[in-house]
Amino acid sequence: MLGLAVTRLRITQIRSSVGEKQNKRGSLRSLRLRHVGDTVDCDDTPQVRGYISACSHLVRVEEIH
């Protein structure tokens, strides 16, 4: 894997999870997001993309290099 650039994602929670279904709240928890304004950097993997798609209306996603 030397020389391969791994795409990273910066994920920011922009809306509260209050009133959301349990699976969407669980996706935020799996992404290590607890409060509005929290930001995490993650590798771009299918698992992370699945979490993002489950709660896409609650988060903002940026690609970083």
UniProtKB/Swiss-Prot annotation:
GO molecular function: structural constituent of ribosome
Pfam families: Ribosomal_L30 (PF00327)
Record CDD domains: Ribosomal_L30 (cd01658)
Keywords per UniProt: Ribonucleoprotein, Ribosomal protein
One annotated Gene Ontology cellular component of this protein: large ribosomal subunit
InterPro entries: Ribo_uL30_ferredoxin-like_sf, Ribosomal_uL30_bac-type, Ribosomal_uL30_ferredoxin-like
GO term, biological process aspect, one: translation
UniProt KW Manganese keyword: no
Keyword Ribonucleoprotein: yes
Oligomer and partners: Part of the 50S ribosomal subunit.
Family of this protein: Belongs to the universal ribosomal protein uL30 family.
NCBIfam families per the UniProt record, alphabetical: rpmD_bact
HAMAP family: Ribosomal_uL30_B
UniProt protein name: Large ribosomal subunit protein uL30
Organism of provenance: Tropheryma whipplei (strain Twist)
Encoding gene per record: rpmD
